[in-house]
């Protein structure tokens, strides 16, 4: 699973997910993409589950790019612990995803295989997504 090697601070504030994604919202590497339509935190386990399902469906053909990285630690306190005595320890990592962000890209496979593989990966995501196709300079989209 994905996680940073080294961070400046061990614990982060939770923060708010306001607005839409201004970066990482266009297809750069592949021909097909999965785009987020809602804001959410996507865990490293969910990212890995989506990647595995896509690679298994596409078999040997094609290349997959993961366009998000979990760089925010989420802390949890132990069960049945009294209030106070500081913040909990980091348990897992999440990627903060805003609407419009490209999650995965794919190339080297036919459209029907890419669409089916992305649909399987979309089931593993906590937010609504849509399938995008890069057609020269035009983008053709369809909601999954």
Curated annotation (Swiss-Prot):
Q: Name one GO biological process term.
A: mitochondrial translation
Q: Does the keyword Glycoprotein apply?
A: no
Cite the GO molecular-function annotations of the record: rRNA binding; structural constituent of ribosome
In this record, what's one Pfam family?
A: Ribosomal_L16
Cellular compartment(s) = Plastid, Chloroplast
Which residues, if any, are the signal sequence?
A: none
- InterPro entries found in the cross-reference section: Ribosomal_uL16, Ribosomal_uL16_bact-type, Ribosomal_uL16_CS, Ribosomal_uL16_dom, Ribosomal_uL16_sf
Is Ribonucleoprotein tagged as a keyword?
A: yes
Assembly, per entry: Part of the 50S ribosomal subunit.
Quote the NCBIfam families the UniProt record gives: rplP_bact (TIGR01164)
UniProt name for this protein? Large ribosomal subunit protein uL16c
The organism is Chara vulgaris
């Amino acid at each position: 699973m994905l996680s940073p090697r080294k961070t400046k601070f061990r614990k982060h504030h939770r923060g708010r997910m306001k607005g839409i994604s201004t970066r990482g919202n266009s297809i750069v590497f592949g021909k097909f993409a999965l785009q987020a339509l809602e804001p959410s935190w996507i865990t490293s386990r969910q990212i890995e589950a989506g990647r595995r399902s896509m690679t298994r469906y596409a078999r040997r053909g094609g290349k997959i790019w993961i366009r998000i990285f979990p760089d925010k630690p989420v802390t949890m306190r132990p069960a049945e612990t009294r209030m106070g005595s500081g913040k909990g320890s980091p348990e897992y990592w999440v990627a903060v995803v805003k609407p419009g962000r490209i999650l995965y890209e794919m190339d080297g496979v036919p459209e029907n295989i890419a669409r089916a593989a992305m649909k399987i990966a979309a089931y593993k995501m906590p937010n609504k997504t849509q399938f995008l196709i890069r057609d020269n300079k035009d983008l053709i989209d369809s909601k999954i």
